A protein has these predicted regions:
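Nucleotide-state-sensitive switch-loop elements of NTP-binding domains
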Residues: 1-47, 115
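TRAFAC-class small GTPase G-domain
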Residues: 3, 9, 19-22, 29, ...
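Short, well-ordered secondary-structure micro-motifs
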Residues: 8-11, 39-43, 61-65, 87-88, ...
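Signal for well-folded cores of large energy- and translation-related assemblies
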Residues: 18-21, 37-41, 54, 81, ...
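Inter-motif core of Ras-like GTPase G domains
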Residues: 32, 39-57, 65-77
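Conserved nucleotide-binding/hydrolysis micro-motifs of P-loop NTPases
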Residues: 34-36, 56-60, 80-83, 112-115
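Canonical P-loop GTPase G-domain recognition
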Residues: 74, 82-126
Length: 126
């Protein structure tokens, strides 16, 4: 529970981690709450930071929220199977992310089609 805050912070993560047997965990994903603005400024102590945007959110999502992309190591452009129906160019989203942060790894994904998952795993260095 984040209380009145719109995001998780390192203190909340630390409290949660104390309740887990970390010897039984090989990989832990933490999904911050809120939108792409609020959690961008808060470092949770992660080894890698991933931002996920969907083509259904429109072509403007990356340029509208540059800070989360600056703070991230990997950008996942999700639901690319819906791009044509939405009139969105996923390559534009990729270019925008790379323009904001040239070192970001960008992966196009369609979970429905099963594409891009291996690339995400590779980007995570797993």
């Amino acid at each position: 529970n984040t209380g009145k805050e719109c995001h998780l912070d390192a203190n909340l993560i630390n409290k949660a981690l104390r309740k887990l047997d970390l010897n039984t965990i090989d990989l832990l994903f933490i999904e911050n709450v809120g939108n792409l603005i609020c959690p961008a400024e808060f470092d949770l102590g992660a080894h890698k930071r991933i931002v996920v945007v969907s083509v259904t959110e429109g072509e403007h999502m990356v340029v509208k929220h540059p800070y989360i992309f600056l703070a991230s190591d990997i950008a996942v452009i999700n639901k690319i199977d819906l791009a044509e129906a939405m009139g969105v160019d996923p390559d534009k989203l990729c270019r925008d992310a790379e323009k904001i942060k040239p070192s970001i790894k960008v992966v196009k994904v369609s979970v429905k089609q099963g594409s891009g998952i291996e690339e995400v795993i590779k980007a995570l260095d797993l």
